[in-house]
Amino acid sequence: MRLKVSEVKTATDPKQWAVFERQECIHAHIAEHGMVNPIVVNSDHELQFGGCRLQYAVFAGWEYIDVIICDDPQEIRRLQDEHSGYEYSFLPEHLIERRQLN
C-alpha cells in the first residue's frame, strides 16, 4: 500500500531527527537501490518502525511511501526482525543495533 508521506504520524518532525552514521548508510543504500522494505504504520498511520526510511523519503521530497499497515504487536515485531535482517546484510558491523531477546 502507498500512503502520502505527510499522512504518516510521528511524535516529532523527521526533518528534526538526528542523522548519524547508521542513518547515512541506510539513506545511501536507499539512494542507490531504492526502498526495498516499506515502513510499518498502524491503522491510525502512526509509525511503528522504519524511521530511517521515512526520514529519507522526507529529505528526498517523496510525496508517497510504501507502507504495511499492522496493529498486531507480534506481527510488527516479526516484520521488524525481518526488515532489520535485511539492513544487517549491508550495514557495517559496528552500526548494527543488537537487541536483547526476551
Indicate where each model-derived feature is located.
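Short, charged/polar connector segments at secondary-structure boundaries
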Residues: M1-D71, E75-L91
